[in-house]
Amino acid sequence: MAERTHFMELALVEARSAGERDEVPIGAVLVLDGRVIARSGNRTRELNDVTAHAEIAVIRMACEALGQERLPGADLYVTLEPCTMCAAAISFARIRRLYYGAQDPKGGAVESGVRFFSQPTCHHAPDVYSGLAESESAEILRQFFREKRLDD
């Protein structure tokens, strides 16, 4: 459990960093054999790319670093429940385990919304563990959007 907490803490660092760059504060860390292979926050505004979610970024970085298109045996830690696009990427990458913090009833696609991994079109479903650092993950998002509303 201490290892899981450590990796989620790194994802929270990435989320905070994303928020400081005026990105929606979501962070992700990809781990293989107990080693961090990639870590990132959202980069959609920085790259002007709607697909530059934290999950997609770490999958791309890890595939490049390892020289392979799939990541069997890898674990992904994310501060927010992945959306449909990210859930599909997780499936295609053959991620072994997904750990996420806060649920996303509006945009999530794992235990909310379309429940992507339960669909017959899903090729691979990771083991899913939700609620890891849930309150911290949710608070980072709440604070970010609270400040956005004050700025408007």
Swiss-Prot record:
The active site is at E55 (proton donor). Changing R149A: 800-fold decrease in activity. Zn(2+) binds at H53, C83, C86. Residues 2-111 form the CMP/dCMP-type deaminase domain. InterPro entries: APOBEC/CMP_deaminase_Zn-bd (IPR016192), CMP_dCMP_dom (IPR002125), Cytidine_deaminase-like (IPR016193), tRNA_aden_deaminase (IPR028883). Binds 1 zinc ion per subunit. It is an enzyme of class 3 (hydrolase). CDD domains: nucleoside_deaminase (cd01285). GO terms for molecular function: tRNA-specific adenosine-34 deaminase activity; zinc ion binding. It catalyses: adenosine(34) in tRNA + H2O + H(+) = inosine(34) in tRNA + NH4(+). Its cofactor is Zn(2+). Its EC number is 3.5.4.33. GO terms for biological process: tRNA wobble adenosine to inosine editing. Keywords: Hydrolase, Metal-binding, tRNA processing, Zinc. It holds the Pfam family MafB19-deam. Belongs to the cytidine and deoxycytidylate deaminase family. Catalyzes the deamination of adenosine to inosine at the wobble position 34 of tRNA(Arg2). Homodimer. PANTHER family: CYTOSINE DEAMINASE FAMILY MEMBER, TRNA-SPECIFIC ADENOSINE DEAMINASE. This is tRNA-specific adenosine deaminase. It comes from Agrobacterium fabrum (strain C58 / ATCC 33970) (Agrobacterium tumefaciens (strain C58)). The gene is tadA.
